[in-house]
Design a protein with these regions (language model features):
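N-terminal pre-Walker A segment at the start of P-loop NTPase domains
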Residues: 1-2
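P-loop NTPase motor domains
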Residues: 6-9, 16-332
Length: 332
């Protein structure tokens, strides 16, 4: 028998080995013991190994903890829990960082990555200010066409802070707009949107979120498409088919939603299968954003605790197979 003192597992444990030498089987042994010990157990498996999933379920059942088990699997979306990887954050800038970190940053790509970060951050700030939770689908929609979000936010802001006659003034300006009297970059925009922009500009109305939307709105559409071209394909992959329903949860779906704070408070068990063999890009993006989310939650717990009145922090055991495929800068 080979024994390992639990005190030796405080911090990180790294297990190295090539294929078929038993690294996953050893992980199963450690996972089984953590489940039976009553820990919060999180298993992240890039390939989505069916045997590992079966072992997690079997051990949870044997420990009387099946009700605590939540399964998120990109390979079986119809049976999977849902998860919004950019919906929870300590700072709003984390939303843009989790998306932009999936983009290449070598050479000339670095500039496009910074542009993508800025525009995603503008969209995320506007959504939160409107009382909406950011998700991949909303980000994809508005990074393709910022105009609807600009109009919504501008109207929301003016309703709260504008003059009593702002609507009439905007309508008057909009009625006089044509392609002959607007800048080339704004040709093709709706007259109502251009009227709002001109009203805000002429009245020197400044608010940080609104200013960001205005600066984006005034770009020529073809130029804007070029500078955010790097993030578009990634978001399309994350928002296509049945995977979109998992990664951008909506209220009408009755499948459970994975929330790390909830998992930790109820001392749950989570199995995550990323199905990397089917789509490496999506698996890497979701896995990296998931780790960034966990790091953010860890920071919240460190500063504020569980927030449920309990002074006792549960033991959290995180098992990540093929960790090198998942790790991002946020975790280091």
């Amino acid at each position: 028998d080979v024994w390992m003192n639990l005190d030796e597992r405080v911090g990180h444990t790294l297990l190295l080995g090539t294929s078929s030498v038993g690294t996953t089987r050893l992980a199963e042994l450690l996972i089984a013991q953590d489940i039976r010990r009553g820990d919060v157990v999180i298993v992240i498996d890039p390939k989505g190994d069916a045997e590992l999933l079966q072992r997690v379920y079997t051990d949870a059942s044997a420990a009387g903890r099946v009700a605590d088990l939540l399964i998120f699997h990109l390979g079986f979306p119809e049976r999977s829990a849902r998860y919004n990887a950019i919906g929870r954050f300590s700072r709003i800038t984390e939303v843009a960082t989790r998306i932009a970190n999936q983009l290449p940053s070598a050479g000339n790509s670095a500039a496009f990555k910074e542009f993508a970060w800025r525009f995603v951050n503008i969209i995320a700030r506007a959504l939160v200010s409107l009382g909406e939770q950011p998700d991949f689908e909303r980000i994809r929609r508005y990074i393709s066409d910022i105009e609807p979000l600009f109009v919504r936010y501008a109207r929301h802001y003016l309703n709260e802070n504008g003059d009593d006659d702002w609507q009439e003034a905007v309508e008057t300006r909009a009625s006089k707009i044509s392609n002959r009297n607007v800048p080339h970059a704004m040709r093709g925009r709706h007259a109502d949107a251009v009227g709002l922009y001109q009203y805000l500009q002429l009245n020197s109305i400044y608010e940080p979120v609104l200013d960001g939307l205005m600066s984006t709105f005034k770009y020529d559409g073809s130029y804007f498409d070029k500078i955010v071209s790097s993030v578009g394909p990634l978001l399309e992959k994350l928002c296509s088919g049945t995977v979109a329903e998992l990664l951008s949860p909506r209220g009408e779906d009755d499948r459970p939603v994975l929330d790390w704070m909830d998992v930790i408070r109820r001392r749950g068990i989570v199995y995550v299968g990323l199905d990397a063999l089917s789509d490496t890009t999506v698996a890497s993006a979701v896995g990296n954003a998931m780790f960034a989310d966990l790091v953010s939650v860890a920071g919240h717990l460190y500063k504020h605790g569980l927030g449920d009145g309990s002074d006792i922090m549960p033991t959290i055991s995180l098992h990540a197979d093929e960790f090198n495929e998942l790790i991002g800068d946020e975790f280091v």
